[in-house]
Amino acid sequence: RNHAVMSSYEPGSIFKPIVAAAAIDAGVARPNDTFFCENGKFKVGNAKVGEAVNHKFGWLTLQDIIVKSSNIGSIKIARQLGKRSYYDYIRKFGFGQKTGIGLPGEAGGQLKELSAWDPMSLASISFGQEIGVTPIQMTSAISAIANGGTLMVPRITRAILKDGQIEKRFEPKIARRVISIQSSRQVVDILKHVVKDGTGKNAAVKGYEVAGKTGTAQKYDPKTRSYSKTAYVSSFIGFAPADAAKVAILVMIDTPQGVHYGGSVAAPVFSNIVRETLRYLNVPSNDQLVYILDRA
């Protein structure tokens, strides 16, 4: 089974850059705008929402909401957007529909029609619950942020060769513009701080600037009809080099044993993959770029 295109997961906190990007692009919030995060407990309808590790955040900027991964802060950002605008951005980012990658069995994920949203939906989706995404959807969406706001149709190859000659070429294909270039740059800067100062420090790669987001999603247990307190999907999604991305990678670990936080489990794997991939692609490190500029 090709989980990258056939399996859907609740993404958890790796979905938070989507609400941040939407709010910034819609002009309803800026990275330095502050939101009160209710000291760790917030009532939404009949439900109570808390923070991971029982954090008790007070006032946080939008940037720090993403850097520190505040669930309540994400809800506050989503409320600034409103249901209709947030739903439209989620669709523009490619969720709830197939990416068109062309691989057999691709799933479209799960995104309820706006008319089916209940009072909790806006809040839940803001921090990556009540929505199902495929890994290729999530990677395509984060790539749109890295690409200056343009969503591309993913491809698995650039060309087909026969006897050393190009038989068929697959040109890059733009799906649509999702957010502006300026908005994308602001979100990229936020995601760089996640790795520099926040939950994603273990994703850092020496010599390169990395941008990304951690996620620790509780798995839904259909037997109890509630979220498990012992089973998680731990993840890290990001790209590098941050300001001129060559690779975007999602690491998802289904039901890790022991430590389960994405920043501890998935981020180090991401770091190792990115380091070796950039080396394989001969992408110069920051030190090499400085040397080249000095020589010039």
Predicted segments, located by residue:
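Beta-lactam-recognizing serine transpeptidase/beta-lactamase-like catalytic domain environment
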Residues: 1-13, 18-253, 292-296
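Short, gly/Ser/Thr-rich active-site loops of penicillin-recognizing serine hydrolases
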Residues: 165-168, 267-296
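A short acidic/glycine-rich loop-to-helix N-cap element
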Residues: 254-265
